[in-house]
Design a protein with these regions (language model features):
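Short HxH-centered metal-ligating active-site micro-motif
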Residues: 2-3, 7, 64, 69-129
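Short, conserved "active-site rim" segments that organize catalytic pockets and cofactor/ligand binding
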Residues: 2-84, 88
Length: 129
């Protein structure tokens, strides 16, 4: 990977698009080798117990931080994990999760040092955030 860590433990740059695509191909191959029926099973209707509404922050990958597999959590992400009645995207996710998938739990999860929450509290948010 081309990712480099600076002196203050910040990621300087991430993987290239080619690396992301190669990683995806490797993941698919390894997954199929471990579980030959995975993709066929995943192509059928999902049955997650949870709807997770979380932040879009790239440092908060839902499956990794919850230890869940594909299909176990239905996810909606936006800046600062906002739920607003006027947001058609969020409302469609809620409706599909509750009425279509019949999830049992809705989790709204924030994270430490969220830039979106900080901007809202400080009054420095721009646009619709």
């Amino acid at each position: 990977m081309s990712e480099q860590i600076s002196k203050n433990n910040q990621i300087k740059d991430g993987p290239t698009l080619s690396e992301i695509l190669r990683n995806n191909q490797r993941w698919a191959s390894e997954t199929k080798e471990r579980d030959p029926a995975f993709f066929e099973r995943s192509a059928t209707q999902q049955h997650p117990k949870y709807l997770w509404i979380g932040c879009s922050d790239s440092r908060v990958p839902v499956s990794q931080i919850t230890g869940t597999a594909p299909g176990e959590v239905f996810v909606h992400r936006n800046v600062a994990n906002i739920v607003q009645a006027e947001d058609p995207s969020c409302q469609s996710v809620l409706e599909f999760a509750v009425l279509g998938l019949q999830v049992e739990h809705i989790v709204i999860c924030g994270h430490y040092k969220c830039g979106g929450v900080h901007a809202a509290i400080q009054g420095t948010a721009t646009g619709k955030v």
